[in-house]
Amino acid sequence: MQVEILATGDELLTGQVVDTNSPWLMDRLWDLGLMVRRKTLVADDRDDLRAAILETTARADLVVMSGGMGPTEDDLTSECVAAVLGVPLERHEPSIEVLRERFRKFGRALTPNNEKQAWFPRGAEVIPNRWGSAPGFTVPVGRGRVVCLPGVPVEYRGLCEEWVLPHVGARLSEVPAAGLVKLFAVPESHADHAMRPVMDDPANAGVRFGYRAHWPETHVKWTVPGPDAAGRAARIRERVLGIFGEQVFGEGKDELPDLVVARLAARGERVALGESCTGGMVAELLTAVPGASAVLDLGVVAYANAAKERVLGVPAELLAAHGAVSEPVARALAEGARRAGGAAWGVGITGIAGPSGGTPEKPVGTVHLAVAGPSGTETVARAYRGDRDRVRRQAAYEALNLLRLALR
């Protein structure tokens, strides 16, 4: 099956909005063994949009289109698909009623421009939208089918999960087995080099391997077709886990903060945080996870030296002798947070996020991290690159990973 993606919207071409829908769908289709062959971006222009619909549907069995489904003058998708088919737009009464009820709940009357969202090319199958006001639709065009979806990410992804992916899966002669392992802070090139024996193994002929690097994660993926796909995928997984060991922090949809919360909860333990340069980012990452209240005791942003002394008990002489950005102070922050919270674990972070404040001995990007636990305190020093935000985020995720390793 040949699949293409067509996204429309001036905002995507002016840089005002980044298209996150297409990469998400590409990733989901990869799990079905399909690689999207082309992605096309088109402005809100009738001529360009009609031409793009004709071009993509001439090549692909399925074109997934996003955007242009709303109530405004520049929402042109339904109109342009109808023009390509040479059919009129027709009012879809069930969608009108859904819109009326939606507006009624907000105490508003349905306006004529919003009714535009319920007009579709004659013969189209309407796809109800439980996440927003604009339904999607699908209709045969060219050699295959076009599916038109709203561009709002939560709506797009919901409709893909509910309609597009099941539609694709039902038309595949076989669904391959897939695997995904997530590595912490492993460069993509290193992962590729380490994976060469697996990729070059004749037993893995026909297996599609892929990588995705987005700091602090590098994803290693594989899709296995054919007979015994599940068994072959499982054997690859065992080899990958053996190659990377503790650098593997999760699989599939695992996220680092979720795993840390889950491990703490499974042990019945809590953590306390003593943050400086990260300004509460570690606490933010943890509290975004449902159930964090059971494992997070306290989070202190001790930015000034006086606060480090007063709140977390960092000795003044330690600060004077080593400076705020140092291994002893990171250790004291972690131990002070653990003591203040009465928690099993304490995390301490101190660093220079920049852009100023660095010295030849301690350049911008220098960060010291510590994890204090029942068996003592472990510390690490890091030299991060990037702007202020990137340094802080790297440090926050590094702290979570150190805690993950301590909880193993």
UniProtKB/Swiss-Prot annotation:
Stretches of the chain forming a coiled coil according to its record: none
InterPro entries from the UniProt entry: CinA (IPR050101), CinA-like_C (IPR036653), CinA_C (IPR008136), Competence-induced_CinA (IPR008135), MoaB/Mog-like_dom_sf (IPR036425), MoaB/Mog_dom (IPR001453)
Disulfide bond sites: none
Gene3D superfamilies, A to Z: CinA-like (3.90.950.20), MoaB/Mog-like domain (3.40.980.10)
Source taxon at top rank: Bacteria
UniProt cross-references to HAMAP family, sorted A to Z: CinA_B
Similarity section: Belongs to the CinA family.
Protein name listed in UniProt: CinA-like protein
Organism: Anaeromyxobacter dehalogenans (strain 2CP-1 / ATCC BAA-258)
